[in-house]
């Protein structure tokens, strides 16, 4: 693994037991992401893309191989240590934003900082600044139900970025957005990859989004290949 990689995996595999059979979903995967790099993973439905994201993010355990996040081998860490590492070094954005409906945009973005024991005044200050950066400074007190789809996704991205992680993973981030809003999300990722050196790993069916990334990888037959 390169010392400069924010994420790396070697010989990564995942299989499941179904009765007497072993079903191989992923096998022998190799991947490295570096600061500021934007990589898209494409593939057909059921090819294992979500399984791969869960393995790379430490939400699932591989059947074989290893994953390193921010220089730490995930399999060598206990559950609590993995959780702390994810909160510090990794942001995650889902297709369905997963914002907490009872909290405002500002409170949702504050949440990772508060989990990391940042003082409330500092958390609010940093979260306000980041929401202003993504064009939502006028929507701080609005709850998710009061925001448009694009606004909710920008709040989710701000929440993923608030701890200044080296890597953000996105699962179909523009799947429910109109073209104009989706392009705004793409432009935001491009800007942040340059200004903050944040790496982005994106799973998508949207080839127009994938083609704007630095690299496109296809997941087929359980392996990653250059698309």
Swiss-Prot record:
Compartment(s) of residence: Cell inner membrane
EC number: 7.6.2.-
Keywords annotated in UniProt: ATP-binding, Cell inner membrane, Cell membrane, Membrane, Nucleotide-binding, Translocase, Transport
GO molecular function: ATP binding; ATP hydrolysis activity; transmembrane transporter activity
Disulphide linkage map: none
Topological relation to the membrane, as annotated: Peripheral membrane protein
Domain of life where this protein originates: Bacteria
Family matches, as Pfam families: ABC_tran
CDD domains: ABC_MJ0796_LolCDE_FtsE (cd03255)
Domain ABC transporter, first and last residues per copy: 7-227
InterPro entries given in the database record: AAA+_ATPase, ABC_transporter-like_ATP-bd, ABC_transporter-like_CS, ABC_transpr_LolD-like, LolD_lipo_ATP-bd, MacB-like_ATP-bd, P-loop_NTPase
Keyword rRNA processing annotated: no
Predominant subcellular localization, coarse grouping: membrane
Binding site for ATP: 43-50
GO terms, biological process: lipoprotein localization to outer membrane; protein localization to outer membrane
Listed transmembrane segments: none
GO cellular-component term (any): plasma membrane
Broad enzyme group: translocase
Family under the similarity heading: Belongs to the ABC transporter superfamily. Lipoprotein translocase (TC 3.A.1.125) family.
UniProt-listed PANTHER family: IMPORT ATP-BINDING PROTEIN, LIPOPROTEIN-RELEASING SYSTEM ATP-BINDING PROTEIN LOLD
Function: Part of the ABC transporter complex LolCDE involved in the translocation of mature outer membrane-directed lipoproteins, from the inner membrane to the periplasmic chaperone, LolA. Responsible for the formation of the LolA-lipoprotein complex in an ATP-dependent manner.
Subunit structure: The complex is composed of two ATP-binding proteins (LolD) and two transmembrane proteins (LolC and LolE).
Protein name per the record: Lipoprotein-releasing system ATP-binding protein LolD
Organism field: Pseudomonas savastanoi pv. phaseolicola (strain 1448A / Race 6)
Organismal lineage: Bacteria, Pseudomonadati, Pseudomonadota, Gammaproteobacteria, Pseudomonadales
């Amino acid at each position: 693994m390169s010392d400069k990689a924010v994420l790396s995996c070697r010989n990564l595999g995942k299989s499941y037991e179904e009765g007497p059979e072993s079903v191989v979903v992923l096998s022998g995967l190799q991947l490295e992401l570096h600061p500021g790099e934007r990589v898209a993973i494409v593939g057909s439905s059921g090819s294992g893309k979500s399984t791969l994201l869960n393995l790379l993010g430490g939400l699932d355990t591989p059947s074989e191989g290893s994953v390193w996040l921010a220089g730490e081998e995930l399999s060598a860490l206990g559950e609590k240590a993995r959780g702390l590492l994810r909160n510090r070094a990794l942001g995650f954005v889902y297709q369905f934003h997963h914002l907490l409906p009872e909290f405002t945009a500002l409170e949702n973005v504050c949440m990772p900082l508060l989990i990391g024991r940042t003082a409330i005044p500092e958390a609010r200050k940093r979260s306000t600044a980041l929401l202003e950066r993504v064009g939502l400074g006028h929507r701080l007190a609005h709850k998710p139900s009061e925001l448009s789809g694009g606004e909710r996704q920008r709040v989710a991205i701000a929440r993923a970025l608030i701890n200044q992680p080296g890597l953000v993973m996105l699962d179909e981030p523009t799947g429910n957005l109109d073209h104009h809003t989706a392009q705004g999300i793409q432009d935001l990722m491009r800007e942040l990859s340059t200004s903050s050196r944040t790496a982005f790993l994106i799973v998508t069916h949207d080839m127009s989004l994938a083609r704007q990334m630095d690299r496109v990888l296809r997941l087929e037959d359980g392996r990653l290949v250059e698309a």
